[in-house]
Amino acid sequence: MWRQTLFDGSDLGLSKPFQFTNLSSIVLPRMRKSMIFLASGELRAYLEKTGRSGGGAHGHLEECTRSDSSGKQFCLIKTSNLEDAGIQTEAFIQWIVQKTLEAEGLGSRVPRVYEIFRNENNSVGFTMHEVLDSKLCGRFLSESRTLERDIIHFLAQTAAILQRLEERLELDHRDLKADNLIISAKPSSMKWKGITIESPFTVHIVDFGFACMGNSGITQMDASDGTLPPLDPCPKEGRDLFHLIVSFYSIPSVRTQLTEPLRSLFSTWLTVSDKSCAGMAEKWLSTEWLYLITSQKKFSNPSCRPEAILQALGPLL
């Protein structure tokens, strides 16, 4: 179990092994004047910002070139707009998620974390691999000429990734939507219990700022920094894929092109406790309403479990 495991954080520049139960006591590398120094004072990496940046309400992203003893890498720097705001927990969750997938041969599906550091003002940030030649899923869908096929493969790839993470880490992303998937042009091949997913593109999951990891449904690690209820069970059955499916269905150009049998599958997936959420997804351009549903302690949608999605999509792949 990850809670009792002592992790080697040397690839993050940490001098000592750590446990997820004591993240606050970890001595992080320091960033000064675009240089990252280890606790020993040794220079670890130099960051050269390219000038392009972006972000949202809970974090800021900047593109940069990272140089270390192994060469140069294109990466992103993520810092918080608020004081820490759980960004240290977010970074460590993304790190263990990527490491877990790497052991399965799927390490590229979540950007690698290079280091987690403290700035000169003592706030926390981290650097991560940048997925090049990629598009946000929402934009990819708007440009797609094979929309239904692409949706089937988006959902199948994402479900195969989440199934592994739920099984090994009891992880919920809790903010999975079209624009938290990045699509790169590299072909993908995945397998799950006899189902083969051969796709002309690769799905990458990003932004773990609301993620949690649990233990028999009890949240143990929470990156949301109080944004979500502290007793919110983790994981919740079907939550992540329900979020993603609602975000797809809320795009008018997507739902109007759905045909059978995918239309019927969406109808099933959008039903929670015998009540359809399709009407709300059609009415509201924003998907904020769905968090009122999934934040309920007893939320459950068995049809949106990763295994259920994969079984439903298997005949369509």
Question: Across the structure, where does each feature detected by a protein language model lie?
Answer:
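ATP-binding glycine-rich phosphate-binding loop
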Residues: 14-69
